[in-house]
Each structure stands twice: as C-alpha cells, then as structure tokens.
C-alpha cells in the first residue's frame, strides 16, 4: 500500500442514494419483476484519494482502512470462483488468510468468515442508470446489515446458540469486509466509502433507508433478511476511495458495526476520469463476523 503526504488528490463521480418513494409508502423491491416504488437519486460527488490524506484512516477510529494483503492463492481460483473445487479452496485457505489479517489489524478477539462474493463490473455509467438495485454494477450506496438484520444473519451464519453466546460475551461486534481487486489494477468502478464522522449521532435509523424485498431467491443461501439498507443523502458526508488499487491491497471496512459510528456505507462509483478502454473490474470480498472485548 502506498500512502503519501502530498497534496490531497480528488476525483469526481456519481453514486445513487434513496430519496423516498413514489407513493409515500414503505419502500419495496420485487425480485420477480424488478418493480419498486423507491426513488433512486443520482448524487454527484467529489471523492478523496485515501493515499493522499493527511492522516490514514483506521478501522478502530474511522471504521475503514487500506492495507497491504498478499494471498498465496493463484488468481485462477477467484476468476472461476463458482466451481466446487475453487469454492472449497477459497473457503478454506483464503478465508483463513482474511481472518488472520482482520484480527491482526482490528484486534478482534474472535473472527468468523461466513461468505464471499466475486464481482465483475464492466458496464458504463449510462448502463448503470437503467439497472435494478441488485445487479453488480449499480452504484447504490448501502450497508450490508443494520441493527435489525445483522442479528438475523449472525444466527443464520453461526447458529442461534453460538450467536447468542457471542453476543452476550462481547461488548461489541460487527461484520467487516475484506475487499480486494483480482487480476488487474482497478481502472473502472472503484469502491467508494462514506465517512460520516462529522455527523454527531449518525445512526442507521436516521441516515439509512429501508427497502423491503419480496420473492428473493437468495434467502436460500444467505438466510432471511428483513430489508436492504440504503443511504440517504447528507451534504456533510466525505467520500473516500483509493486510486489504482492493486491485487496486493485490500480495503477493510465495517459493513455493519454495533456502534453505528463505525458502520460504513459503501458502493462502487463511476469515476468521471475513467478511460474508454478501462478494463473490467474484478474483485472479491469476504465478510467476517468480528467480536471485541
């Protein structure tokens, strides 16, 4: 990872946030026909390059951190991640690499990797404007879980008995993402993190929008989820990314934390400086339950 003290570098781009509903009712999304009443609002943003910040963010203070990370697995395992053989290797070898990294960086007393996602984002900004909330390349800013849906997923991941034991044993917990490019330097759709430290008492209930889903086939693999949690706009947000991320770097960030101050809304964003010939962005993220004394 390269971090300098040079002049702050920024770029501009666009993300989408939730801006209420068309009918004033609870937000919904139907997976069967892609129907929704949610108003998706494009927001032009100025994004700060983490490499040129005067102070490097940390998971303990800001909820996110850019780190060096070298896996011993060849990239082929990630590029063909759905094959049973590669899936097994990722869940055994890569999960353990991520677990050790996360515990070393965050100081978590216990850590349990529970799922991974490999994404290929190749479309352009115009295509993203026509897409639904759940395609890989839609830059909708969100958190993976909130204070309602996190316990649901924790119980589904670890079993109700173990989940309750861990919740009673530790003072705080979270779901941390280890997000890393695969194969190429990121040239398109970099990951953007929202820093809300300047907003006192920021909370999931005050600055996030709940989107209720129906007919979601993913329930079979990830467990029940009461709703998705999408960001609403606030002019006080700071937007952070890392320029030219390589496969030997990773973002660590809390996609949920029991202390909302450390929960980080995130999403891909369209960088206005993206070149026409930019390569498809391939990335892998591993989600890990972490517990703190």
Swiss-Prot record:
Q: Does the keyword Nuclease apply?
A: no
What top-level class of enzyme does the UniProt entry assign? oxidoreductase
Q: Name one GO molecular function term.
A: oxidoreductase activity
UniProt keyword list: Oxidoreductase
Q: In which pathway does it act?
A: Secondary metabolite biosynthesis
Q: Which InterPro entries match?
A: AsaB-like
EC number(s) from the headed UniProt entry: 1.-.-.-
Presence of keyword Heme:
no
For this chain, the family text in UniProt reads: Belongs to the asaB hydroxylase/desaturase family.
Cited function:
Oxidoreductase; part of the gene cluster that mediates the biosynthesis of squalestatin S1 (SQS1, also known as zaragozic acid A), a heavily oxidized fungal polyketide that offers potent cholesterol lowering activity by targeting squalene synthase (SS). SQS1 is composed of a 2,8-dioxobicyclic[3.2.1]octane-3,4,5-tricarboxyclic acid core that is connected to two lipophilic polyketide arms.
For this protein, the record's PANTHER family field holds: BLL6449 PROTEIN, OXIDOREDUCTASE AN1597
What is this protein called in UniProt? Answer: Oxidoreductase clz16
Biological source species: Cochliobolus lunatus
At the highest ranks, the source species' classification is: Eukaryota, Fungi, Dikarya, Ascomycota, Pezizomycotina
Task: Quote the gene name from the UniProt entry.
Answer: clz16
């Amino acid at each position: 990872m390269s971090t300098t003290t040079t002049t702050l570098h920024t770029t501009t781009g666009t993300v989408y946030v939730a801006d209420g509903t068309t009918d004033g009712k609870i937000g919904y999304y139907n997976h069967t026909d892609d129907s929704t009443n949610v108003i998706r609002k494009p927001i032009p943003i100025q994004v700060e390059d983490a490499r040129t910040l005067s102070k490097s963010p940390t998971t303990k203070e800001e909820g996110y951190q850019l780190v060096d990370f070298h896996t011993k697995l060849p990239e082929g395992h990630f590029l063909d991640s759905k094959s049973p053989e590669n899936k097994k290797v990722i869940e055994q070898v890569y999960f353990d690499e991520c677990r050790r990294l996360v515990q070393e960086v965050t100081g978590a007393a216990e850590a349990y990797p529970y799922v991974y996602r490999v994404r290929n984002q190749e479309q352009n900004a115009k295509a993203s404007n026509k897409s639904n909330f759940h395609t890989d390349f839609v830059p909708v800013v969100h958190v993976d879980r909130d204070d309602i849906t996190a316990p649901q997923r924790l119980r589904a991941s670890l079993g109700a008995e173990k989940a309750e034991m861990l919740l009673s044993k530790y003072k705080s917990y979270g779901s941390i993402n280890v997000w890393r490019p695969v194969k190429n330097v990121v040239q398109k759709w970099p990951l953007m993190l929202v820093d809300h430290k300047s907003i006192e008492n920021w909370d999931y209930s005050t600055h996030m929008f709940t989107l209720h889903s129906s007919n979601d086939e993913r329930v079979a693999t990830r467990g029940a989820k009461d709703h998705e949690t999408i960001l609403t706009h606030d002019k006080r947000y700071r937007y952070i990314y890392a320029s030219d991320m390589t496969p030997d770097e990773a973002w660590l960030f809390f996609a949920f934390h029991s202390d909302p101050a450390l929960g980080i809304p995130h999403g891909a964003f369209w960088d206005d400086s993206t070149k026409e010939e930019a390569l498809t962005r391939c990335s892998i993220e591993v989600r890990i339950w972490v517990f703190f004394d």
